[in-house]
Amino acid sequence: MKKQRSFVLSLLFILVQYTLAAQQLAPDSQLLKNIPYYEIDNEDAYIRDRCLLDIFIPAAKKEFPTVVWFHGGGLTGGEKFVPDRLLNKGIAVVSVNYRLNPKVTSPAYIEDAAAATAWVFRNIEKYGGDTKKIIIAGHSAGGYLAMMIGLDRKWLARHNIESDNIFLLVPFSGHTITHMTVRKERGIPDTQPTVDEMAPLFHVRQDAPPLHLITGDRDLEMLGRYEENAYMWRMMNVAGHKHTYLYELHGFNHGEMAEPAFDLLLKIIHNQ
């Protein structure tokens, strides 16, 4: 059996792996930065500072798909970025910052993810995007957020958005049990699995959007992440959901799996 990488090293890798030295944009494409997705006059200074998004808009194309991307970092760190592997591929990318622990606690992270997604539904047509082709994705903590707002209807319903209108859910190695940081807030150790209303697994349902679960190698992933996702796949099937898929990227650990997962994400989108 392959040696499990340490939790600390894996988390550090998540936080630094996406630093982009330069982003090569195609002519006539655009990268718009630091757009607030809450009301601009919000009285909360942390919301004004943190709750921003960037948009990459592809060149010379209309009614394009849009990937809403949530970064990883354990709900305690990380920074928005537009993945370079998604640039100039005929899709828009909306990269989202959300509030982090310890400045906030659950469910603030999910509230922000829902608010940003609602902003995209209401605004992406202005940039040429198709509201019927909005994909919610993210790595690690970002994958957890993607599943929570896609499976638990209440978060987007607060913005009068129906979560079933999401085109695809594509989490990269996301917790399907209650997130370890949420468990820590409640005094539960990260080695103690918990499934409650803050777990994607709690919200398994037949009529959810199509769900593509991508993980790294089961022997290299952190804290049983492959097995969590495999159980999610099984229970969605048991619930009667016809479009749940599970992909294991052999040879890649929790941090490394994101790079090949981006290519898989593009393939999934273009095969629809």
Name each model feature, range by range.
Residues 160-164, 168, 174-182, 191-230, ...:
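The feature captures the conserved acid-bearing segment of alpha/beta-hydrolase catalytic domains
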Residues 63-72:
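Short beta-strand element of the alpha/beta-hydrolase
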Residues 23-61:
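N-terminal cap/lid segment of alpha/beta-hydrolase-fold proteins
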Residues 105-125:
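Alpha/beta-hydrolase active-site loop
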Residues 214, 230, 237-272:
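C-terminal catalytic histidine-bearing segment of alpha/beta-hydrolase fold enzymes
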Residues 79-96:
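Short amphipathic alpha-helix adjacent to the substrate-entry channel of hydrolases
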Residues 121-184, 196:
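Primarily recognizes the serine-hydrolase "nucleophile elbow" in alpha/beta-hydrolase
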